[in-house]
Amino acid sequence: MKKDIHPDYHTIKVEMTDGTQFETRSTWGKEGEVLKLEIDPKSHAAWTGGKQKLMDKGRVSKFNKKFQNFRSEKKD
């Protein structure tokens, strides 16, 4: 096996949307950093049965905001 080709695998903390945290091992970030989730099983529509809230910074939201006043008028 080749040496020094694999990313560093270390312990990080993951913070859920309700503020609870747990430790796991990952290649994300650096040792001890906190990964804050925006969507998790406690808030995702697939697990809660509710409608999914689109993020304001999401691509669909940006598109809809940009073109909210645009209307296609049919010419005869």
UniProtKB/Swiss-Prot annotation:
In which domain of life is the source organism classified?
Bacteria
A single GO CC term for this protein reads:
ribonucleoprotein complex
Q: Which GO terms describe its molecular function?
A: rRNA binding; structural constituent of ribosome
Intrachain disulfide bonds:
none
- For whether the record's keyword set contains Transcription, the answer is no
Q: Which UniProt keywords apply?
A: Ribonucleoprotein, Ribosomal protein, RNA-binding, rRNA-binding
Q: Which InterPro entries does the record associate with it?
A: Ribosomal_bL28/bL31-like_sf (IPR034704), Ribosomal_bL31 (IPR002150), Ribosomal_bL31_sf (IPR042105)
Q: What Pfam families does the entry give?
A: Ribosomal_L31
The GO biological-process annotations, alphabetized, read as: translation
Q: What does this protein do?
A: Binds the 23S rRNA.
State how it assembles: Part of the 50S ribosomal subunit.
What family is this protein classified in? Belongs to the bacterial ribosomal protein bL31 family. Type A subfamily.
Xref: NCBIfam families: L31 (TIGR00105), PRK00528.1 (NF001809)
Q: What is this protein called?
A: Large ribosomal subunit protein bL31
Record the organism.
Pelagibacter ubique (strain HTCC1062)
